């Protein structure tokens, strides 16, 4: 089904409903108690500075109501205050950088240069990165990222380079995603998930679980175990697809069809609400699969290895945190968003 066909079918339905979850399978997310009003204000000020926003402006209010730092506070509920602030800045940067690299007002050459500069900064090569970026505003943002990474490196053990390498892949995939959008390529679901599981930015966030908690799983080869790989794959797909479910309306309004909803509609030649229901069902199936895999890890004896259950539970917390934050944040819903208590609702296209 071509994009124009999907557009006409979706337009005819005009609205869609996200159903409530039929079963509560994941652990309820708990907010890091150290992420207080002071930490939240620090993240908001950093975001304003990164985007050069006037406090109180519409964009600044939107960023505050998006509560980007809150995702870090839910996803890493047990880390110290010294860690949670740079982690929250990094996660906020992930969202802001995604917006910047999607900005049609930035020239393609500037876009390529800043993407390359970001990769170099993750490798600790800021001086070289600075030579690439001619746009002074983009250069200022690259420098701010470099400062966050220096702060983060004081707390994040990354001997294997897993965090750095996974972020390089994310930035590479952002460029591929941009190319697909420009050419209006409609991939099949497997190809889309190959892209989405990387552009979602989940891999570096899972790497931080190992590094921040200093579990040493990567160095001990534990992450190569098939059951751990399966847990990571399920968690990554769940986070990416739940995000697609929540962000669909915003992405569709921007003309971004690289979302699981239109991809499913294209594959199954179905309408909007049917595609939404399919996606919601896929998310729940992933939760069931995660719980089953977690039980396998326990019964196999793998859980007795030091740090394994800290990591597995950390992935589960990330899944639940992303789902919770998606309903709380105004990022996908707009200023003045009031989260529905049942985490379900009907939305107008």
Swiss-Prot record:
Signals that turn on the gene: Up-regulated by alamethicin treatment.
Pathway per the UniProt entry: Secondary metabolite biosynthesis; terpenoid biosynthesis
Key words of the record: Lyase, Magnesium, Metal-binding
Cited Gene3D superfamilies: Farnesyl Diphosphate Synthase (1.10.600.10)
Sections of the chain in a coiled coil: none
Pfam families: Terpene_syn_C_2 (PF19086)
Residue positions binding Mg(2+) 1: 98, 102
Domain-related comment: The Asp-Asp-Xaa-Xaa-Asp/Glu (DDXXD/E) motif is important for the catalytic activity, presumably through binding to Mg(2+).
Function: Sesquiterpene synthase converting farnesyl diphosphate to six sesquiterpenes, with beta-elemene, delta-cadinene and an unidentified oxygenated sesquiterpene as the major products. Has no diterpene synthase activity.
Protein name: Microbial Terpene synthase-like protein 1
Organism in which the protein naturally occurs: Selaginella moellendorffii (Spikemoss)
